[in-house]
Amino acid sequence: MYGALRKALFLVPPERIHGLVFAGLRAATTPVPLRRSLSRRLAPHDPVLASTVFGVRFPGPLGLAAGFDKDGLGVHTWGALGFGYAELGTVTAQAQPGNPPPRMFRLPADRALLNRMGFNNHGSAALALQLARSSSDVPIGVNIGKTKVTEPQDAPADYAESARLLGSLAAYLVVNVSSPNTPGLRDLQSVESLRPILSAVLAETSTPVLVKIAPDLADTDIDDIADLAVELGLAGIVATNTTISRDGLKTPGAADLGAGGISGPPVARRALEVLRRLYARVGDKLVLISVGGIETSDDAWERITAGASLLQGYTGFVYGGGLWARSINDGVAARLRENGFGTLAEAVGSAAR
């Protein structure tokens, strides 16, 4: 049924329909009786799916990835739709408009999206106010990025300001140095640049801190970031962000859409490779959150057994619809029982053991 609805929705420009659908989801989950009704049907209630990760209790492993709810307007929404948590942002220390539109595109033959949003958001102070007056029945993480006008040498202070404002209001923080849509941002993934940023954020908050990395990094750079994360005592790594690669795309005209990061199935293979490499490198020293191209419960199960304690999706939600998260949760719960696991944690990394 959603397939027919999706065809109609896809007749509207991507950013516009995103706003309309998001507004509709918020409206549908604002009345408490409606939200409770949806939660009974869609939320992960099976205890086998629950886990405690970096001291936070997650009712299910699948979260909403950063980028969908940049300013925390739907904090009350995501648990009722089946997500075990949500990651807000990316938010920057200063409010900024992002890149000029059009800046979001569909690649339907690839079931993918291309975006060059450029961290459009209302700023960390505004998100802090929003979180202070909001409530959620699932953990809420916050993804923080660098303000575009901030010079690279001032990046540590910029990230630290967001951490200061948001740390106490979030279940965890993610330092985003991997978006391809802010000039020079990915250069901050070098250990020399990343160390002072992470150190500055850690100095501002006792909330668990993770770093989000790009799929386009060389393997040696992934190893270096993993080692740095362990050294500094980070809670974990989010792998991966969108890719700038255009290899293997099937959608006609995709090459003409211009700059931006691609999410969905085109990044899945590399996201899994990075996850496996990270797990082999750090084992249980860090929590690994896998994101990128997860569409089915089989995909989710593969990531969990490869070492992911938590998962995230955005593009899969766009193409899969409102029942997507529940289908992932139901499939993972079935696989846990089929394979004799009593808890989700027992399955994490089991394919590598």
Curated annotation (Swiss-Prot):
Subcellular location: Cell membrane
EC number from the UniProt entry: 1.3.5.2
Residue numbers binding FMN: 66-70, 90, 143, 176, 212, 240, 264, 293, 314-315
Entry keyword set: Cell membrane, Flavoprotein, FMN, Membrane, Oxidoreductase, Pyrimidine biosynthesis
Catalytic activity: (S)-dihydroorotate + a quinone = orotate + a quinol
Major subcellular location class: membrane
Enzyme class: oxidoreductase
Membrane topology recorded in Swiss-Prot or TrEMBL: Peripheral membrane protein
GO biological process per UniProt: 'de novo' pyrimidine nucleobase biosynthetic process; 'de novo' UMP biosynthetic process
Record flagged with keyword Oxidoreductase: yes
Domain of life: Bacteria
GO molecular function (one): dihydroorotate dehydrogenase (quinone) activity
This protein's GO CC annotations: cytoplasm; plasma membrane
Binding partners and assembly: Monomer.
PANTHER family linked: DIHYDROOROTATE DEHYDROGENASE (QUINONE), MITOCHONDRIAL, DIHYDROOROTATE DEHYDROGENASE (QUINONE), MITOCHONDRIAL-RELATED
Function statement: Catalyzes the conversion of dihydroorotate to orotate with quinone as electron acceptor.
HAMAP family, A to Z: DHO_dh_type2 (MF_00225)
Protein's recorded name: Dihydroorotate dehydrogenase (quinone)
Gene name as annotated: pyrD
